[in-house]
């Protein structure tokens, strides 16, 4: 029996659409990666973040009190440098063109959709970076007088949420959330619950679908 050419044509048509959408999705995402990379390139934010998080793990896992104090003493300069660099980055990011700074609140990346989405389904990543900069700086300064372990835990959450925003900007929310879980074994909701109250209020207000 001869194959149903109309059905085959339909499947080929669908396949062509899927391949085309995947191509344009990758191109859009690569443009985002390059754009963010230009603003991040003057800084060592990612390297300092990794150094700090690794340092916290070594500090918390050290049994010798003297050695533990020595490790903690070296982390203060990293915290301060990271907060200062991210604040400068957030200031630089204000120069990002407004249309390119818009991020879809939808979980999946849909090619060509971003310029067509209503404002309530978009947020401005420049505002998100400003929220993260304030949150990181506030925890580093520790005006609330948190205990060292509580402060380290909260600062770690602030940094992970900031990293999630960077991935969301470049790859979409679903990919950012999956990366957070895969790399740090931490759900997005848990990170949001662990940042400072001010960061959480500002962040949730920004990403809410109003």
Features from the language model and the residues they span:
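Glycine-rich, aromatic-bearing surface loops/beta-hairpins
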Residues: 146-210
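Short, structured coil/loop segments at alpha-helix boundaries
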Residues: 42, 64, 68, 115-129, ...
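N-terminal signal-anchor transmembrane alpha helix of single-pass membrane proteins
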Residues: 1-41
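Generic structural signal of hydrophobic/aromatic residues within well-ordered alpha-helices
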Residues: 32, 36, 71, 89, ...
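A broadly tuned preference for mixed-charge, low-complexity surface segments
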Residues: 69, 99-114, 183-191, 206-210
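N-terminal topogenic membrane-targeting module
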Residues: 26-97
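Regular secondary-structure segments
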Residues: 46-64, 133, 137-144, 160-167
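Interfacial alpha-helical end/capping and short helix-turn segments at domain and membrane boundaries
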Residues: 79-163
């Amino acid at each position: 029996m001869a194959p149903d050419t109309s059905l085959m044509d339909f499947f080929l048509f669908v396949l062509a659409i899927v391949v085309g959408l995947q191509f344009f999705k990758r191109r859009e995402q690569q443009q985002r990666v390059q754009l963010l990379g230009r603003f991040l390139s003057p800084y060592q934010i990612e390297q300092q973040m990794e150094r700090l998080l690794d340092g916290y793990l070594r500090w918390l896992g050290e049994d010798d009190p003297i050695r533990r104090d020595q490790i903690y003493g070296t982390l203060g300069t990293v915290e301060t440098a990271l907060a200062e660099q991210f604040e400068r980055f957030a200031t630089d990011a204000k120069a990002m063109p407004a249309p390119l700074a818009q991020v879809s609140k939808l979980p999946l990346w849909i090619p060509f959709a971003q310029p067509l989405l209503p404002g309530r389904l978009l947020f401005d990543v420049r505002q998100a970076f400003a929220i993260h900069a304030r949150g990181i700086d506030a925890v580093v300064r520790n005006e609330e007088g948190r205990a060292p372990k509580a402060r380290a835990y909260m600062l770690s959450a602030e940094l992970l949420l900031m990293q999630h925003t960077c991935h969301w900007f470049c790859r979409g929310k679903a990919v950012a959330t999956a990366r957070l879980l895969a790399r740090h074994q931490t759900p997005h909701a848990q990170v949001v619950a662990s940042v400072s109250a001010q960061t959480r209020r500002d962040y949730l207000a920004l990403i809410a679908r109003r």
